[in-house]
Amino acid sequence: MTALRIGDAAVTRCDITFPRRGVWCADVDLDTETAPTGRVSVVVDGGPTWSGTVVSGGVSHGLWSGRIVGGAGGLRNVLDARAYRNATLADVVADVLTDAAEAIAATAGDLGAAAALWHRPRGTGAAALGSVADAAGYGWRVLADGGVWLGAETWPALTLADVSLPVRSGPEAEGRI
């Protein structure tokens, strides 16, 4: 059986959501009376590790229940408006990530496109990154290591041989797959 841990505490329940675009989050229960705080690692024995930040939670009856979000947790914060002139998308992203206390992933795509005039309205860091990603035709997400990735989406080719569809039979299944 695979075991998940956060620090020295065993994870007794974990629902992790990995959106194609955005910040991953984990709703967890830990077998501990000591509440985790700040940056934590969700570790799968013999498997991956996710680096995130505790954003809410509490202890009840010897069990901590809470939410962990990918990265430093700053993309949910409201950032002040900013105006740019003769900048690049890299400049805009760097400011968003600095203001949100986040870090760019080493595998991020090319953000060298010019942004002659760019306005970042007051809003969350996630919304600001979404605007840049839209302008560049990129996707964005927080990776397992906590870094923020923006880049061109690439997916492996899928052939019909890779897909298995259940076939129903009988009169109730007529016209259905």
Model-found features: residue ranges?
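Short beta-strand-centered interaction patches in the first periplasmic/extracellular domains
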Residues: 63-65, 70-73, 104-174
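Soluble non-cytosolic domains of exported or imported proteins
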Residues: 83-87, 91, 123-127
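Assembly/oligomerization scaffold segments
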Residues: 1-81
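Second-shell loop/turn segments in exported
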Residues: 78-86, 116-119
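Short, glycine/charged-rich beta-strand-loop motifs at protein surfaces that mediate ligand recognition
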Residues: 177
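Short intrinsically disordered coil segments
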Residues: 44, 82-87, 163-169
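Glycine-rich, acidic and aromatic/proline-enriched surface loops and short helix-turn segments
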Residues: 86-105
